[in-house]
Structures are given as structure tokens and as C-alpha cells.
């Protein structure tokens, strides 16, 4: 997972004698920016959207290390709360199945140290991912219909950008 600030992109483009002509916000995968650039001889400066976003980045302390220290503290606290709940569920001998074998979900699993001793399966509609294992955590990837085999199961949605679609599908498989 990578993300560049508009300020960092602007600086890289300036080194290549380019300027930001326009910026589009793209909703896909939780949001990203699509940046269009032109040679600086064709556009005098970065567009007003770029200047506005760079100002927002500065005002929100994006370039201050303390911002990331606080973020990490909050992240670790939330991870600990989440793990307490996951282990409580597992102590009840209930199955936990991950939904969606996306790369972002695997990053989540590895950061939370969740492996095949905690997550029983990962389901994915893609036959190209089925009958394989998640990297590092070694959780088997199976088809979505595995949900029909369980009376009681917890679903951990790992493809959260399409969670609404996945929830509907899971209810169809196992109402």
C-alpha cells in the first residue's frame, strides 16, 4: 500500500519540469488521486486544486512526525481491542472466516498476526485464488459457498471497499 501526498508529487514533477494540470478524486479502493501533469512551458503553475490540497496537507500536520506517532498509538490500541474480541470469539469454539482474499486484507491479517490458528478460511469468488493460501499467515482460500456449511460463523470482511456487496452475498448464502 502506498500513498503520495500532492506536495511530494508536485516536487517530483517540478524536477522533471512538469506542473500539475488537474486532480481527480477516485473512489475506488477507498479513495485515491489521479493527477494529470503537463510540461511547465504549457502550464505556468500547479492548478488551484493542487495548491488547495497542499495547503490542507500542511494544515493537517501531514509532514509532522508526531502526527504519525499519535496515529501509531491509536492503531496499536485499536488492534489490541480487536484482538481481545477475536480471541473471545475463538474461546467459544466459533469459526471465523475471512471474506475476500485482497492484498489489503492480507496486510491487515499480517499486521494483526492473524493466521490459520485463528481464521479458519478466507473466501473469495475468484477461482484463481481458491485452493491456495494467504502469504505468511497460511490461511486456506476457498469458495464463498463454505458459509452454507455453518450454523454459526463470524465473517471478517477483508475487502472492506466492497463490504455492502459482500454482506448481501453472505446473507444469500447463509441467511
Where are these regions (language model features)?
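Short alpha-helix
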Residues: 1-17
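Conserved S-adenosyl-L-methionine
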Residues: 17-29
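Flexible, glycine-/basic-rich loop-and-beta segments that form/coincide
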Residues: 30-74
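A short, well-structured juxtamembrane/interface segment
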Residues: 74-94
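Substrate-recognition/cap helix-loop segment adjacent to the acidic, metal-dependent catalytic center
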Residues: 107-120
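Short, flexible loop segments at boundaries between secondary-structure elements
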Residues: 120-134, 175
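Phosphate-bearing ligand-interacting subdomains
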Residues: 138-175
